[in-house]
């Protein structure tokens, strides 16, 4: 409940009480909005769309998985045309740009938070979300490339706001998406990322958050002032190194606790469908919490259905929408099935769940503690 503040207190005390009042009010508003945005209805709509597309496309993500790998990873070893003119990107630069926005906080802090809130079972529902999310992102990218625009110098640009207007004819809906998408960029794309980075840096090396923020702003400025072409070039070098480094580190951590892996995998599946005793009765509340956390963090991580990735893919120089759409399936597979799973295994193998999440300061710090605990041999299950 929101506590009132009293002006009869000394000025300094009243100021502190006022700050606490507004902070608590903001937290309550945020919690209310969060309950709607990441509530059951919205999450089932997102996942339900993926289910619908999976059925209509004949389970393309599984049926053509090998073809997808040959068309994406395989294309990196074949001679292809470079981006032609303007600020266009190669297909790989486009997917690297999209992955740069998805691989990050959601894979580490988001997954850790989901496990703390929903238990090991949240990992299973995260996998389910990713499987159907592959088709959602595939469809987003196909539409973005099909309905993209070309300016005077041959530069491609597009995204959901363009295919919403041209595909449905409802311009107001496209404008609404653009406005809400701009707002979401601050919360999902900037604040969440920088906050977790700052929290982890402060926890690990004692660097004040202000200095971390300044450093991030400077590094980001050097990239974005070069336009979409510079972003694509930087992402094409940074993302593969970042992903490979994390995958190697994650695999190494798992190998250190390889004997405990079967038990952890078993807990993921059993907890996904477990009925716990609550208040003397047995309810499926634990399953609902695990599903919500798994679905929410899966979507937050791979951004399937959010509309951000199609903007990067629309700038690709590819001429075939379906070909670029396969990169969307690849994105979700790498982001969630591989990287998020590695984070999940590290957290579950480390024993950090025995402590309260608040004792670590942030989800990112808890994930770092998990990796550190295993590496120095102090973990126990």
Q: Which residues does each predicted region cover?
A:
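Flexible loop linkers connecting adjacent transmembrane helices
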Residues: 59-89, 113-115, 119-120, 127, ...
């Amino acid at each position: 409940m929101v506590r009132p503040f009293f002006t009869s207190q000394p000025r300094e005390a009243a100021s502190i009480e006022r700050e606490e009042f507004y902070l608590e009010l903001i937290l309550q508003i945020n919690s209310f909005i969060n309950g709607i945005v990441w509530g059951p209805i919205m999450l089932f709509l997102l996942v339900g769309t993926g289910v619908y597309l999976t059925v209509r496309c004949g389970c393309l993500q599984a049926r053509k998985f090998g073809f997808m790998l040959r068309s994406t990873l395989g294309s990196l070893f074949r001679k292809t045309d470079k981006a032609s003119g303007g600020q266009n990107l190669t297909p790989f630069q486009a997917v690297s740009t999209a992955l740069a926005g998805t691989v990050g906080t959601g894979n580490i802090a988001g997954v850790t938070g989901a496990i703390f809130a929903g238990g090991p079972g949240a990992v299973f529902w995260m996998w389910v979300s990713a499987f159907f999310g592959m088709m959602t992102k595939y469809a987003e990218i196909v539409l973005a490339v099909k309905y993209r625009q070309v300016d005077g110098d041959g530069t491609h640009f597009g995204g959901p706001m363009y295919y919403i207007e041209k595909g449905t004819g409802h311009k107001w809906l496209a404008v609404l998406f653009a406005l809400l998408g701009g707002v979401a960029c601050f919360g999902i794309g900037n604040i969440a990322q920088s906050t977790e980075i700052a929290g982890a840096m402060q926890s690990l090396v004692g660097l004040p958050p202000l200095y971390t923020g300044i450093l991030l702003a400077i590094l980001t400025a050097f990239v974005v002032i070069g336009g979409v072409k510079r972003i694509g070039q930087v992402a094409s070098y940074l993302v593969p190194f970042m992903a490979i480094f994390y995958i190697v580190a994650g695999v190494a951590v798992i190998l250190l606790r390889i004997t405990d892996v079967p038990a952890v995998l078993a807990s993921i599946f059993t907890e996904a469908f477990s009925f716990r005793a609550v208040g003397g009765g047995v309810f499926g509340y634990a399953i609902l919490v695990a599903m919500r956390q798994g679905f929410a963090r899966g979507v937050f991580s791979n951004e399937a259905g959010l509309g951000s990735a199609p903007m990067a893919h629309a700038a690709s120089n590819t001429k075939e929408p379906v070909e670029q759409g396969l990169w969307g399936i690849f994105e979700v597979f790498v982001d969630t099935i591989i990287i998020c799973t590695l984070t999940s295994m590290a957290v579950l193998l480390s024993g950090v769940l025995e402590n309260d999440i608040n004792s670590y300061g942030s989800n990112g710090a808890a994930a770092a503690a998990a990796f550190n605990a295993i590496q120095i041999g102090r973990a126990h299950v």
